[in-house]
Structure formats: structure tokens, C-alpha cells
């Protein structure tokens, strides 16, 4: 079982502090949140740690579903820079958000927003494939601005495009899915965090009401070979979540 942690837990600190902590726990993988304040990441720095990597493409002020051409194209360009980084450091996956829909766009142009997202996802997937990088798309939580909260619709799109999903366990729970509704062959990467279904809280594993054992055992029974990234709020939560994984699996 491959287990790692996201640098999101230490986003307010220097990247080195997060990587040092993740390495100190004995984890094998770190997922680099490739946006401010870590927009520029030194390959030599990464190679100084006994870690392997995945990349989370930027999502702050980035929207690949934007109806505005310049915003959408700039967002795709930023994500392509994360794919370039993944190629340079031999990262196992790049994680991409499918985009958001503003109030006005949701009211008048919801169909078009999904069409723009789909077009962008295909473009990103093609760019990644050309470099031999695996791009994955997240299922999203139950917030008004989020698209692809419907995990089944996302899976259908990714199957059509021959692309892959990052299953975000906490997002699926927040969107109302049970453990037996969210296992697909398209899943090649996992973000693990807990909640009570009322918020996307990113709690340590075991501190919410998600049936984590059922989900992870189902993935393992399908011969899942990807990484389980602990995507929680702080360093202590990484430690608690890693202890949960070691105790239960």
C-alpha cells in the first residue's frame, strides 16, 4: 500500500518544512500543492528528500470551466505547468479540479460550463499523455459553485476520454454518496480525509462518519495500485491519519 501526505497541511510554511515532516514520519510520498506560495519548486530540493511525488495542480483563482476564454485558457496553461513539473520529477500523478461555476454562470449557462470543463479536461489529458504523465480529475464536494459533484457523471466522462479519477473520499461523503457507490475502475489516485457529511472538513481519518474501512478494502480488492494521499489540515492530522492507516490496513 502506497501512502503519502499533501503539503496542503503546511501550506502556510516553507515547502521544506512540510517535506521534512512528511519524510520524518516514514511516509514514501508527498503531494506537492503547486500554487502560491509554492508556485516555483526546485527539482534539486525535491531530490534532497527520500520521497516520491504526486502534484496537485493549482486551484486558487484557476477555473478550467470558465466561460471567459482568457480565464479558461490561462487556467489550462497553469495546469500544464504542473504537468511539466510532474514530467521533470517523475511524479506518479497530477491532480486537477474540473472547475467551478459562478452564480451567474450557474443561472444562465450551466450546460455551457460543463462543456467548457469537458473540453479543458480533454485538452489537459492529451497534453499529459504526450509527456507520459497521468492526469487525474477530482470529484468535488457539495458546494453551490462546484461542478462534477456527481461522481457517476465524472466517471462516465473519464471513461469516454480514457482518463482517470482522483477519488476524494471526503468529497464523495459530503456529496451524499455511500461507500458502495464510489468505486470505479477509473480511480488511479486517492485523497483520504474524513468528515460528518455536513462540510468538507478534511478531518483526520477516523474522526468523522465515513466508512473508510469499507472504501479502502473495496479499492484493495480491485487491486488498486495508486497512492493514498492524506489530505488533511495540519501536521498533527497527518500523523493521526497515518496511524489510522497503519492500524487498520
Residue ranges and their predicted role:
Residues 60-96, 207-221, 229:
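Ligand-binding grooves and catalytic loops that recognize ribose/phosphate and carbohydrate rings
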Residues 61-67, 102-107, 197-203:
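A short acidic, helix-capping loop that chelates divalent metal ions and anchors anionic groups
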Residues 29, 54, 136-137, 166-169, ...:
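Generic enzyme active-site microenvironment
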Residues 1-83, 87, 164, 248:
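N-terminal pre-domain/capping segments
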Residues 1-2, 12-23, 91-92, 147-155, ...:
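Histidine-acidic metal/acid-base catalytic patches
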Residues 71-164:
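Active-site acidic/histidine proton-transfer and metal-coordination neighborhood
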Residues 6-10, 33-37, 58-60, 99-101, ...:
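Active-site beta-loop-alpha junctions enriched in small/polar residues
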Residues 47-61, 117-128, 156-160, 212-215:
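Alpha-helix-loop-beta-strand connector modules within alpha/beta enzyme cores
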Amino acid at each position: 500500500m502506497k501512502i503519502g501526505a499533501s503539503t496542503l497541511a503546511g501550506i502556510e510554511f516553507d515547502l521544506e518544512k512540510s517535506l521534512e515532516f512528511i519524510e520524518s514520519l516514514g511516509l514514501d510520498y508527498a503531494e506537492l500543492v503547486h500554487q502560491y506560495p509554492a508556485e516555483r519548486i526546485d527539482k534539486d530540493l525535491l531530490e534532497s528528500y527520500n520521497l516520491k511525488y504526486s502534484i496537485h495542480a493549482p486551484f486558487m483563482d484557476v477555473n478550467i470551466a470558465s466561460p471567459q476564454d482568457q480565464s479558461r485558457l490561462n487556467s489550462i496553461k497553469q495546469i500544464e505547468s504542473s504537468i511539466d513539473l510532474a514530467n521533470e520529477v517523475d511524479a506518479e500523478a497530477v491532480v486537477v479540479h474540473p472547475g467551478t461555476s459562478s452564480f451567474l454562470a450557474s443561472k444562465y449557462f450551466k450546460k455551457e460550463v460543463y462543456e467548457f470543463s469537458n473540453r479543458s479536461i480533454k485538452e489537459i489529458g492529451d497534453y499529459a499523455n504526450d509527456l507520459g504523465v497521468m492526469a487525474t480529475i477530482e470529484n468535488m464536494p457539495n458546494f453551490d459553485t462546484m461542478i462534477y459533484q456527481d461522481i457517476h457523471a465524472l466517471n462516465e466522462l473519464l471513461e469516454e476520454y480514457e482518463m482517470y479519477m482522483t477519488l476524494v473520499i471526503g468529497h464523495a461523503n459530503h456529496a451524499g454518496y455511500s461507500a458502495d457507490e464510489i468505486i470505479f475502475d477509473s480511480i488511479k489516485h486517492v485523497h483520504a480525509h474524513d468528515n460528518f457529511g455536513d462540510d468538507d472538513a478534511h478531518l483526520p481519518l477516523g474522526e468523522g462518519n465515513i466508512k473508510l474501512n469499507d472504501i479502502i478494502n473495496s479499492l484493495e480488492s480491485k487491486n488498486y495500485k495508486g497512492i493514498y494521499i492524506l489530505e488533511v489540515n495540519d501536521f498533527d492530522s497527518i500523523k493521526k491519519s497515518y496511524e489510522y492507516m497503519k492500524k487498520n490496513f
